[in-house]
UniProtKB/Swiss-Prot annotation:
GO terms for biological process: methylation. Methylates ribosomal protein L11. This is Ribosomal protein L11 methyltransferase. HAMAP family: Methyltr_PrmA (MF_00735). The keyword Transmembrane helix does not apply. Its EC number is 2.1.1.-.
Length: 309
């Protein structure tokens, strides 16, 4: 579908909120954004986000505002925080597309914008095609990078994988590329579920081997009896992870492994402590910039855990 017009959303944030905004945009499959320092206040940044006009109705834009407001802990009851405008496609798309480039992650994965032809030098890589709405950058977050880097050393062949907080579907796609026989993707935002389905279809031509679930993790696993996973991928914020760990334990089969990301380096010790308290064995910790990735394993024999809501 040809995109004629775009919404441009502009708002201001404290500079130290940039990481969390990038993380959430990546989670939702939104990759067309920029951050600019304010000349008069270097402690603040202006955020610009471009969204396809035809795909973002009033309800979608309102829901998106609520998501950002919740993250930034603001009350925009007077609707003055967010500024929406309509931008003609020819005013920006052509000039920004030239800045797109394939993004190599680790040694094996390549994130490729869907309209760019694959260069011969990357033909030996595992290609993850992404359609971010003709944006000017993948905005790949360190937490996603860390997960993919960890995944390239895992044999997913014939394995069952759970992706919690699937977002744009990058990790689900990577697991399937690695040979996973079944991928279950869970997210509590319908925009993210739509993005996961769309990008999975783009890579494989169908939605075979993928099951998506909309809702909170704890509710979804109870309702759908999701269990006996070989691997769980959990790229979400540490505060959310803490409340999920007992149920993640329950979802894993014996000797199953979980990869946690979305954790700041300052939070990793607390997460590790909770993992150990829940009978998960720490396997590895890696970091990139200010973010950490933690992998753990469910031992073959442990006390039974209940699922908590």
């Amino acid at each position: 579908m040809e995109i004629k017009d775009w919404y441009k959303l502009t708002f201001q944030i404290e500079s130290d909120s940039e990481d969390i905004i990038i993380w959430k945009l990546n989670e939702l499959g939104i990759f067309s954004f920029s951050f600019e320092y304010l000349i008069k206040n270097q402690n603040k940044k202006e955020v610009n986000i471009w969204l396809p006009f035809d795909s973002w109705d009033n309800n979608s834009r309102s829901d998106f505002e609520k998501i950002i407001s919740k993250i930034l802990k603001i009350n925009d009851s007077k609707n003055k925080f967010f500024n929406w405008s309509i931008i003609k496609e020819e005013d920006w798309l052509t000039s920004w597309k030239k800045f797109w480039a394939p993004e190599l992650v680790g040694n094996h994965f390549l994130i490729l914008p869907c309209w760019i032809n694959l260069n011969e030098k990357f033909k030996d890589k595992q290609i993850i095609k992404i359609d971010p709405g003709a944006a000017f950058g993948t905005g790949s977050h360190p937490s996603t990078y860390l997960c993919l880097e960890k995944m390239e050393n895992i044999l997913f062949s014939d394995k069952k994988v759970l992706d919690i907080g699937s977002g744009s579907g990058i990790l689900s796609i990577a697991a399937r590329l690695g040979g996973a026989k079944e991928v279950c993707a869970v997210d509590n935002d319908y925009l993210a579920i739509n993005s996961t389905n769309s990008n999975f279809q783009l890579n494989f031509g169908n939605l075979n081997n993928l099951n998506t679930y909309l809702g909170s993790f704890n509710e979804v696993i109870l309702k759908n009896q999701l269990k006996q996973f070989d691997f769980v991928l959990c790229n979400i914020l540490a505060e959310v992870i803490k409340g999920m760990i007992p149920n993640i334990y329950k979802c894993l089969r014996n000797n199953g492994e979980v990869i946690f990301s979305g954790i700041l380096n300052s939070q990793k010790d607390e997460i590790i402590k909770i993992l150990i308290q829940n009978n998960l064995k720490l396997l590895d910790v890696s970091s990139r910039k200010n973010w950490a990735c933690i992998s753990a394993q469910k031992p073959a024999s442990n006390p039974k855990h209940k699922i908590y809501l």
